[in-house]
Structure formats: C-alpha cells, structure tokens
Amino acid sequence: PSFPRASVDASPMISLKNPDLQAPRQKAIAAMRASLSPEQWERNAQFVAQLRQEIAQHPVSRHPAIARLNSGTVRREAMEQIHLEYRHAIVQSFTDALLAAQMQSRQLEPRLAPGSKMAGRFLLTLNVLDEFGFRPGQDAQGYYLGNPAYAHYPLYEDVLNAYGISNEARVNHRPSAIAREVRAFLEDSYGRYTDVATLLAVAEEEVILFSPPLRKATGALGLEVNDGYYYVHGVSDDDSAEAADDDHEDDLWFILTQALTDADRESLRTLGLRYCDLWVRFWDHQMTLADGATAWAKPGAETASA
C-alpha cells in the first residue's frame, strides 16, 4: 500500500559550503516526518502512542523479577545464570538487529520518495554509534572519537568477567528454551523493516525496565557498577552517566512511525505484544530456576556466596 507523501520537487539544492550539522537527531526526525503527508504521520504517531501505552501496561512492566532484583538479595549463582541467559536472549544479537533494520529500510522505496530511507538510517546510525563505542566529538587529529573496547557487547562481557564466568563456561552454557525463543523471535524479524523496528523498540523498553534492577543486584554483591556496562545501562536518570536508552527507544518508535502503513497496524501490535509475552516467560523462567536452586536469598541473609 502507498499513501500521500511530501513532494520531492519543492526543496532547494542542499549546499555543503556552509553545512548545518547541528541537532542531528532532530534533523533526522524532521526529515522522516517530511517524507509522509501530515495526515499519515499523525495517524501513525497515534498508533505508536497507543502501542507504547499498551506495552507500558503489559505484565512485563511490573514483573516480580524487578522487585526481587531491586531487593539486593539475589545470590551470586543466580545472578551468573541470569546474566548468561540475558546475554543469549538479547545482548549478543541486539546490534545484529540494528544493522538488519538499517539494511531493510530499503523497503521504504519506492513507496516513499527517493532518499527517504536515509533519514531512518541516519537515526539508526546514531544508535549504532553508541552501541559500537563511538562518542561525540573529534580526536586530536580531527577524526571521530571512539574505541571498539567501549562497545556495549564487550562491556557486557566484562561484567561476566567480574562475575568470574570463564570463557569455557560461556561457550558451554546451554541457554534455556525460552532464552532461545526470545532470541529467535527477534532474529526472525530481520527480513521486514517494520517488524524489526517494532521489536527493537520493545527490546529497548526491556533494557530500560530490567537494566536498573540487574545493576542494583550486581552492585549488592560487591561488584563494580559505577563504570563499564552498568555505567551506560541502568542509570538513565543519572546525568553523570552515559546512558542513552531513552533516546534510543524514542528513535526506534520514530523509525516505526515513518515506516508504518495503515495495513500494518494490527499485525505489528500483535507482534510487539507477543514479544512482551515472551519476555514475561523469560523472567518467569529465571525466577523458577533460581528458586529451584534456592538461589534467591531470604531478606537479611548473606547475598554473596563463596
């Protein structure tokens, strides 16, 4: 299906002699908005707002695991297991999904005007730069600032190092069925732009929900959480930290707002809520495993194990 879009003939030639490079996120969002008619953008934005509200009210948003982790009474064995499971479910494949979305933005054309895919790719790139370890600014040679060691996935591996989880244990870890299902559900979306954008936005919401409790439970064991992975995840309300999860989530919803057609709505709503359902089962399973191993400490009990 197609819908009215902004004319591509009315814009003057872009000049590079005096480039305007300020506020890149806002410029990308404005360009995405301009690629649709005002009426279509508004309809899409209303749908996205309704879907976000449904997700905010979904049981995953108040899962008991949040309170249990925040209690700081989770034993080390359980936390090691949870981090390995979470690694398989989302950490290892998250940037794969971002790159899949960048590629599949090609599906916007020719339904939208030539070049319309680039604003979305630009916005996704800002997310990817953070994930890959780049930072705003220029180095001493006037080049980009960045270090692959600061990419979020390697930073997560450093958390496993802090827990004392060996490389052999990581390789030999057998993810639970639900961890495999959560991962596969995202990976199966890679072929369709609207699908992967929807699930990435939901995944960011899960990161925002569960990173602070995971950080708190990790810190309660005496592990460092004021640097590394938990310095960029789990501290969205800390101005001194480098978290950008809220911006990333908003960006992905803007991506979806541009990409939507009227015919997509019900299928994407179902897709997003099914992914939330899987995350409920994922956290149910983590708690069940931990309870079965008597790994959730009683209030007041020693939280660090030998």
Where are these regions (language model features)?
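Non-heme di-metal
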Residues: 11-306
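Acidic, Ala/Val/Gly-enriched low-complexity intrinsically disordered segments
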Residues: 6-10
